[in-house]
Amino acid sequence: MLPATFKLCAAISYQHLRNVTGLRRQAAVAISQELSKLSCRSTGPSTWISQVRRRSSLLSSRLEEKPFSEMEMSYIKQGEEALQKSLSILGDQEGWKTETVADNGDKVLSKVLPDVGKVFRLEVVVDQPLDAVYSELVDNMEQMGDWNPSVKEVKILQRVGKDTLITHETAAAPPGNIVGPRDFVSVRCSRRRGSTCVLAGMSTTHGAMPEQQGFIRAENGPTCMVLRPLAGSPSQTKLTWLLSIDLKGWLPKTIINQVLSQTQVDFAKHLRQRMARAAGC
């Protein structure tokens, strides 16, 4: 009886692991397929799309190095979904309208999507190499509140593997306090391959951070930042930031659009200042 029971338990456990592994492979296959579509639709970003595809092809084998719980796999899947959706939006060059163009060339564009709403796209060049920008945005993520006036605090709630994080972000009140206190709980994933980095995210839930008194729990995503060296100038970084946020509450769309586009412009300005100080300029 005991050997039979053991075999039954082992079979159930094996089947569970097969199912979890299948989810991992499905995530990698989905991203690879989406990137293939993007490469066919758009010739502009085909180089970095190919680089990310090579990175995602390693996803299944790398994830299998350590078994994850169902909750952890859920976070990984959410991060991959944010990555896939973001790349799909950025890969479609049609329908973008210019919101603002700064004197230094910084540009904010927008687009209305049926299933997402209005999204914003920032395109800037940072006079620092990719490694330095990546380190500031990823490795020093919890220090963002020190230099970004739109952010009060970023806290990492949980790490899942090497590339997935769950974070809590508290937004700083904008001038005039036209938008009340907001906070976010997000799942973030990063993919880096060669000279291309993609940082994607979307809203999620986490037991360690229920809705906080005095804050409206807003939602974001899909969002993503794409970093790659500026063509012909590897000491500079081309940064593209896709922003999609639902601030919740009763706010006129004109105010929301103004706040979000200005948030992107301010981010670029303060990121440059932060990078210049770090480089001793």
From Swiss-Prot:
Reactions listed under catalytic activity: cholesterol(in) = cholesterol(out)
SUPFAM superfamilies listed in its UniProt record: Bet v1-like
Oligomeric and partner information: May interact with TSPO.
Pathway(s) the chain acts in: Steroid metabolism; cholesterol metabolism
Biological processes annotated in GO: cholesterol metabolic process; intracellular cholesterol transport; regulation of steroid biosynthetic process; steroid biosynthetic process
Species this chain originates from: Gallus gallus
Name of the protein described by the UniProt record: Steroidogenic acute regulatory protein, mitochondrial
Coiled coil: none
Tissue: Expressed principally in steroidogenic tissues as ovary (granulosa from the largest preovulatory follicle and stromal tissues) and adrenals.
Known role: Plays a key role in steroid hormone synthesis by enhancing the metabolism of cholesterol into pregnenolone. Mediates the transfer of cholesterol from the outer mitochondrial membrane to the inner mitochondrial membrane where it is cleaved to pregnenolone.
One annotated Gene Ontology cellular component of this protein: mitochondrion
Record's subcellular location: Mitochondrion
Keyword line: Lipid transport, Lipid-binding, Mitochondrion, Steroidogenesis, Transit peptide, Transport
GO molecular-function term, one example from the UniProt record: cholesterol binding
Ranges for domain START: 67-280
PROSITE patterns: START
Tagged with keyword Transport: yes
